[in-house]
Amino acid sequence: MARQTYNYHVTHFVTSAPDIRHLPEDTGIEVAFAGRSNAGKSSALNTLTNQKSLARTSKTPGRTQLINLFEVEDGIRLVDLPGYGYAEVPEEMKRKWQQALGEYLQKRQCLKGLVVLMDIRHPLKDLDQQMIAWAVEVGLPVLLLLTKADKLASGARKAQLNMVREAVLPFMGDIQVDAFSSLKKFGVDKLRDKLDTWFSEITPQQADKDDDPSIGE
């Protein structure tokens, strides 16, 4: 099937949900964005969609406590998962977030890809590795975006990229690693290309046909 290209600039907010049970129907295709509270996840979504405030950026990390859904077009959604790993969030709340994240990654059938964002200077913290492990466990492809890449000189950036690529080999999953900078618009094309690929693998129309037993009888 030929790969489609999508216009991410028309992406719009649909709804927020505290957990998987409150999400809309499990149809179409979703790609989720996950990352530590200060990894630049909201900034990356805003850069991708060319909208300054699609995903709210907060000066106080850890504010995104809900699963936020955005629609690119009918049946094609980007999902902003709760930021994790912020020290000042109470333990009970942390546990709830991690449970919601794990449940979403492992049970949401329309989820077709996971983007994990990590500060290029501090990659692969324990919770980042947990997200990757959950995704690989269910056969989900992963794009690791090393954010804030403008903070490092070219040589150091390449060294970090190579280090992370080596470090994720033991996960044995479909994992791609790229550098990204919202500030310099660095890596946006690669992100867009990967999303186009994931969203083109099965169209919502095909998904509906697959679900309808009367078709093809």
From Swiss-Prot:
What biological-process terms (Gene Ontology) are attached? division septum assembly
**Binding sites annotated in the UniProt record for Mg(2+):** S42, T64
State one Pfam family annotation.
MMR_HSR1
Q: Which residues bind GTP?
A: 35-42, 62-66, 80-83, 147-150, 180-182
| A cellular component annotation (GO) from this entry | cytosol
Q: Name one GO molecular function term.
A: GTP binding
Record Gene3D superfamilies: P-loop containing nucleotide triphosphate hydrolases
Q: Which cofactor does it need?
A: Mg(2+)
Has the keyword Nucleotide-binding been applied to this entry?
Answer: yes
UniProt similarity note: Belongs to the TRAFAC class TrmE-Era-EngA-EngB-Septin-like GTPase superfamily. EngB GTPase family.
Please describe what this protein does: Necessary for normal cell division and for the maintenance of normal septation.
Q: What is this protein called?
A: Probable GTP-binding protein EngB
What is the organism field in this record? Edwardsiella ictaluri (strain 93-146)
| Gene that this polypeptide is encoded by | engB
